[in-house]
Amino acid sequence: MKSAIHPDYHTIKVVMTDGTEYTTRSTWGKEGDTMNLDIDPTTHPAWTGGQQTLLDRGGRLSKFKKRFEGFGL
């Protein structure tokens, strides 16, 4: 395996939407960083089997709906 071509693999803390925290190894961020999830397996409709409404984080969903409201799909 070639050296110095792979990203740094380190420990981070992941915080799920319900506040549950766990530690994992990742290439995301830096050692000791915290990743706060907007959606996770406990809230995503694909894993819960429900038709939950997704939270509009940062206005993206509202912007999309406003942009395409006249199409009548």
Swiss-Prot record:
One of its GO terms (biological process) is translation. It holds the Pfam family Ribosomal_L31. SUPFAM superfamilies: L28p-like. InterPro entries: Ribosomal_bL28/bL31-like_sf, Ribosomal_bL31, Ribosomal_bL31_A, Ribosomal_bL31_sf. Transmembrane segments: none annotated. Signal peptide: none annotated. Belongs to the bacterial ribosomal protein bL31 family. Type A subfamily. PANTHER family: 50S RIBOSOMAL PROTEIN L31, CHLOROPLASTIC, LARGE RIBOSOMAL SUBUNIT PROTEIN BL31A. Binds the 23S rRNA. This is Large ribosomal subunit protein bL31.
